[in-house]
């Protein structure tokens, strides 16, 4: 009964998926609300997930030659306006500072929604020669975008992210960088977060403000909606021209450098929740779980049980695992439900009979399977089980993606498939904006990406009947 009471605090996802998501965020102690709409407090458990993702990404960035920097939070309005497409894309979401103390500022300052303009202004001061290139920078920070509709992790007015910004001598180098960073995001999602992705190009309508090309990784959530989980942008030399960034090349000629930017945010935590979670709460992949193993003493009042549980925690920590024991006076049922809600990948139970038999019982969070583990094999078996859980979560998510991706050969069929099944609908496309808008208007789907891995489904666009140029994914997105 105690377990049921704990779990019933979470709305079933089949009843109301949006409320289920909010319940999990709050009940699992990931976030709390602040007094300002859209500004969320990230609690220690939620922040620990972000720290683990951050550590993985930061290592990959540094391994590819990138350096961390810190740019100011405030951008002068005149600076933001230097690149026309960029400012038009972000103007509706900007938050402005107009007062400094009791004095009105001579120029409005934008709280950064992204930092391209700040990096460009800096580079205009320091880049003069081909020897100054490439500039490979990244920063970890928060940004502000004044969203109208807000939700924890998915749509916050302030959110944490990393934004990489690089400057290169040639288009080829910049394009290589753009794709390299997209692949880092894809590998992180698939290998660390157990979230399968579709890699591809954004359409001109959906690309980043000021970009020549935007590349994306798209993930499918448990409710079969899409989540854009990371993007990488090639800007050409547009920003360089706007900010007068020039360098002397190896032929002693003046040239404009080529620019990229790429970002991943705490939105991926929302993706984690919606990809792996269930009606008991979070289900976390072991690679990024703040606690990988929770050890629970059963019949803790019996002699030697608590001591043995403490010993197991110490051994697991010594083996390099993130392990913790629950020695509170709550009932076993309450503890089971609590740690299930928090998504801990493995629960290890140890009681008097287990000690006598020389084993413990490991319980997988993802499927509830119970595995007997000999105590003298603990350090070998538990890491193996964690890897099994990690792979199992990826495989389950990949099945969800594959089973809910459909091919359509007409607009009517695309609409019918989406309304009946949700998921991704793949069709051919002529490349015209008018057909993209009609798909949105008639079938309620936006373009997700033009995948790198192309298939030939038809010769013509299903919307207009003109010759098709590519295959494209459509879907309803967060």
Please provide the spans of the model-predicted regions.
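NTP/phosphate- and nucleic-acid-binding module
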Residues: 1-478
């Amino acid at each position: 009964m105690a377990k049921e009471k704990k779990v019933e605090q979470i709305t079933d996802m089949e009843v109301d998926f949006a409320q289920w998501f909010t319940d999990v965020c709050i009940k699992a102690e990931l976030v709390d609300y602040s007094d300002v709409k859209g500004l969320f407090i990230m609690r220690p458990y939620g922040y620990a997930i972000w720290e683990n993702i951050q550590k993985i990404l930061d290592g990959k960035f540094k391994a590819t030659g990138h350096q961390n920097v810190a740019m100011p939070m405030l951008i002068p309005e005149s600076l933001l306006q230097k690149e026309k497409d960029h400012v038009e894309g972000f103007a509706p979401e900007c938050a402005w500072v107009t007062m400094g103390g009791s004095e009105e500022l001579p120029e409005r300052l934008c709280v950064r929604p992204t930092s391209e303009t700040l990096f460009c202004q800096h580079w205009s001061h320091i880049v003069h020669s081909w020897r100054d290139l490439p500039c490979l920078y990244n920063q970890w920070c928060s940004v502000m975008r004044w969203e109208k509709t807000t939700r924890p992790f998915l749509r916050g007015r302030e959110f944490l992210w990393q934004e990489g910004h690089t400057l290169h001598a040639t288009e080829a180098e910049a394009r290589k960088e753009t794709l390299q960073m997209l692949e880092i995001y894809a590998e992180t999602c698939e290998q660390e977060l157990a979230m399968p992705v579709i890699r591809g190009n954004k359409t001109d309508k959906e690309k980043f403000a000021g970009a020549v090309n935007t590349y994306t990784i798209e993930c499918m959530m448990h409710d079969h909606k899409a989540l854009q989980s990371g993007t990488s942008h090639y800007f050409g030399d547009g920003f360089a021209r706007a900010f007068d960034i020039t360098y002397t090349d190896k032929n002693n000629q003046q040239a404009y450098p080529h620019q990229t930017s790429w970002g991943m945010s705490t939105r991926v935590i929302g993706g984690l929740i919606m990809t792996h979670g269930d009606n008991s709460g979070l289900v976390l992949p072991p690679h990024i779980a703040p606690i990988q193993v929770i050890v629970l003493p059963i019949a803790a009042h019996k002699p030697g049980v608590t001591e043995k549980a403490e010993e197991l925690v110490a051994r697991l920590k010594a083996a390099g695992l993130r392990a913790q024991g629950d020695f509170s006076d709550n009932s076993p049922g309450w503890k089971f439900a609590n740690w299930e809600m928090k998504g801990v990948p493995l629960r290890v139970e140890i009681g008097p009979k287990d000690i006598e038999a020389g084993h413990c019982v490991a319980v997988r969070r993802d499927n509830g399977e119970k595995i007997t583990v000999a105590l003298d094999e603990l350090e070998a078996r538990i890491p193996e089980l964690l890897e099994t859980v990690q792979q199992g979560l990826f495989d389950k998510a990949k099945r969800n993606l594959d089973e809910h991706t459909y091919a359509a050969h007409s607009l009517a069929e695309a609409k019918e498939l989406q309304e009946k099944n949700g998921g991704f609908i793949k069709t051919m496309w002529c490349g015209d904006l008018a057909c993209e808008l009609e798909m949105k208007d008639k079938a309620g789907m936006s373009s997700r990406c033009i995948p790198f891995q192309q298939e030939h489904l038809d010769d013509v666009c299903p919307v207009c009947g003109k010759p098709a140029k590519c295959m494209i994914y459509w879907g309803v997105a967060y």
